[in-house]
Structures are given as structure tokens and as C-alpha cells.
């Protein structure tokens, strides 16, 4: 039987974005600005919700958790990528790659599940307003979020352990700007059919099930809104849901394009663009979507900034 020499891979080379060195430096500055905007914008959401007692409701509790996840989400990939481009060091250790993969999968799934819970929260608020307080009490919301964190960590751990058991003997060059599932599977010289099955089975369950729940929730919401006779009531219901629906379309549309569509051995530019959209652009736009189109958030933000200004003048 023919024996094949296997080289133990101790590090990977992240090629980054498919562009020239000069363009990559410009993109690194752009992504750093996007990262700072994402971090500051989402921190502002968390601070505003914590400051204004009128925002201490399940809807804004979930929104503050989403803002926290978005900060962690972008922090998993962007700082490492910017440092690699600016220093010219494109390598990442095997352990570092698995760590990045674990947290990335955790946060992307948490984002998905939180969007689902927020859709259900809007469904209860609009379709069953009299039962809203009983169904969405604070204790239940905390337990729900804690359960979601547990599920996402277990799912990420499953993928990380499966990747750690693969052999990498042909190449250690990752055609991507961070350690993601598809590029790592394409590098492996092991049989990855089980990994692919897990991605489509378990990953699909955690990604598509929330999407179905969101679609069902909004279907019931829109049917209820059509029955509202008051024009003002309809406008308020639509404005409440439009922010969340915009985020859902942006996040799910790009994420599904990456993980549930055929990919080539070298990640095409379209996949890279889709990854940037849901991992960088969506978290950056969320604060603007939720603050500029939400009266309560704008009012709370104005109150907080006004109090900070008065405090500084004293």
C-alpha cells in the first residue's frame, strides 16, 4: 500500500483580500474605520439603553445583546486582518486559527438566533399585546439569551473539534482574510464529507430554522397590521418592524450566499464580498438603522448626550 508523507501544519497563511498590496493597505484603513464605527455605534446603543429607563423592555434588552454580539463578531476578524496587512505578517498559528473559527461561528450563530427572538418579540407585542408582559418577562428573556449562548458555543465547539481532527498535507495557504469553515475544508487532505454534512444539517438547522420563524412571525404580523383600522397604528407597527426586517434581509441574504451555495477551491470574489457584507457591513449599519429609524432610541440618545453635556459644564 502506498504511503504518503504527511506534514503537520503548525500555522496557516491568510492571503487576505484578492487585491494588490497597495489596495490591501487602503482596504485595511477602510476596514479599521468600519470597525471603529461598529464598535462605537454599538457601544452607544448599549449605553443609551442602560441610561434610559424607558428603554428597559424586552425589545431593547435583545437589541443591547445584539449590539454586544456585533462588537464581538467584528472583533474576531477585523483587528487580526488589519494587523496582518500593516505588518506584512500573514501567518496565524493552528491554535489561533481554531480559536478564531470557534468565536466566529459562535457569534454568527448568536446573531442569527437573536434576530429570530427579536422577531418573536415583535410578533407578541403586535399580535398579542395583552399577553406581552406575561410572555416576555425579564426572567424569561435572561434565561432565553443564556440558552442561546449555550447552544451557539456547543455548535461552535462541534465544528472546531471536527476541524482539529482533519489532516492538512497539501497546502497551508487560506484564500481568505480569516479562518472560516469552507476555506479550511478546501485545504484538508482528509475526507471532509462528514464535516460538510454537519454544516448543512446542524448549521442549516441553526440558520434556516430561525429564518423560517422570522418569516412566519412577520407573516402573522403583517396579517394583523392589515386588520388595524387606525392609520397611525399601522404606521407605528410598520416602523417598529422595518428596522429589524432591514437587518434580517442584509444579514441572512449575504450569509446564505456564502455557506449554502456552491464554492470553488479558491474562494471567489463574490463569496469574499458576501462575507464582508454580513461580517462587517451589517454590524456597522445596525446602530444607524436602529437609532435613525427608532423614535424611542433617538429620544434616549438625545437625553443621554444632553446629560453628558450638562455634566461636563458643571
Swiss-Prot record:
Cystine crosslinks: 97-189
Cytoplasmic side: 50-57, 121-139, 220-236, 293-314
Domain of life: Eukaryota
GO cellular component terms, A-Z: membrane; plasma membrane
Membrane topology according to the record: Multi-pass membrane protein
Protein location: Cell membrane
CDD domains per the UniProt record, alphabetical: 7tmA_OR1_7-like
GO biological process, any: signal transduction
Residue numbers on the Extracellular membrane side: 1-25, 80-100, 159-195, 260-272
Major localisation: membrane
Residue spans crossing the bilayer: 26-49, 58-79, 101-120, 140-158, 196-219, 237-259, 273-292
Keyword terms, alphabetized: Cell membrane, Disulfide bond, G-protein coupled receptor, Membrane, Olfaction, Receptor, Sensory transduction, Transducer, Transmembrane, Transmembrane helix
An example Gene Ontology molecular-function term: G protein-coupled receptor activity
Entry-linked PANTHER family: OLFACTORY RECEPTOR (PTHR48001)
Function: Odorant receptor.
Family to which the UniProt record says this protein belongs: Belongs to the G-protein coupled receptor 1 family.
Protein name per the record: Olfactory receptor 1C1
Organism: Homo sapiens (Human)
Gene for this chain: OR1C1
Amino acid at each position: 500500500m502506498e504511503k504518503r508523507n504527511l506534514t503537520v501544519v503548525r500555522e496557516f497563511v491568510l492571503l487576505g483580500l484578492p487585491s494588490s498590496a497597495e489596495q490591501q493597505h487602503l482596504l485595511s484603513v477602510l476596514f479599521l474605520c468600519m470597525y471603529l464605527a461598529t464598535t462605537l455605534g454599538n457601544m452607544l446603543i448599549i449605553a443609551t439603553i442602560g441610561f434610559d429607563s424607558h428603554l428597559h423592555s424586552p425589545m431593547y434588552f435583545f437589541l443591547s445583546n445584539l449590539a454586544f454580539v456585533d462588537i464581538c463578531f467584528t472583533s474576531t476578524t477585523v483587528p487580526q486582518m488589519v494587523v496582518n496587512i500593516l505588518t506584512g505578517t500573514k501567518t496565524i498559528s493552528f491554535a489561533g486559527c481554531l480559536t478564531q473559527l470557534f468565536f466566529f461561528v459562535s457569534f454568527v450563530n448568536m446573531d442569527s438566533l437573536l434576530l429570530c427572538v427579536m422577531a418573536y418579540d415583535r410578533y407578541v407585542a403586535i399580535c398579542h399585546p395583552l399577553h406581552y408582559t406575561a410572555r416576555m418577562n425579564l426572567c424569561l428573556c435572561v434565561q432565553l439569551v443564556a440558552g442561546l449562548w449555550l447552544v451557539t458555543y456547543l455548535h461552535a465547539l462541534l465544528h472546531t473539534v471536527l476541524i482539529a481532527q482533519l489532516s492538512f498535507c497539501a497546502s497551508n495557504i487560506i484564500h481568505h482574510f480569516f479562518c472560516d469553515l469552507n476555506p479550511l475544508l478546501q485545504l484538508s487532505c482528509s475526507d471532509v464529507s462528514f464535516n460538510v454534512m454537519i454544516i448543512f444539517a446542524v448549521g442549516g438547522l441553526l440558520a434556516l430554522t430561525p429564518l423560517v420563524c422570522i418569516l412566519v412571525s412577520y407573516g402573522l404580523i403583517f396579517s394583523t397590521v392589515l386588520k388595524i383600522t387606525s392609520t397611525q397604528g399601522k404606521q407605528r407597527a410598520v416602523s417598529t418592524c422595518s428596522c429589524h426586517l432591514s437587518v434580517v434581509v442584509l444579514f441572512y441574504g449575504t450569509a446564505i450566499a456564502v455557506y449554502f451555495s456552491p464554492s470553488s477551491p479558491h474562494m471567489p470574489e463574490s463569496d469574499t464580498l458576501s462575507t464582508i457584507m454580513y461580517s462587517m457591513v451589517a454590524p456597522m449599519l445596525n446602530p444607524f438603522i436602529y437609532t435613525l429609524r427608532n423614535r424611542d432610541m433617538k429620544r434616549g440618545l438625545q437625553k443621554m448626550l444632553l446629560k453628558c453635556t450638562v455634566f461636563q459644564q458643571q
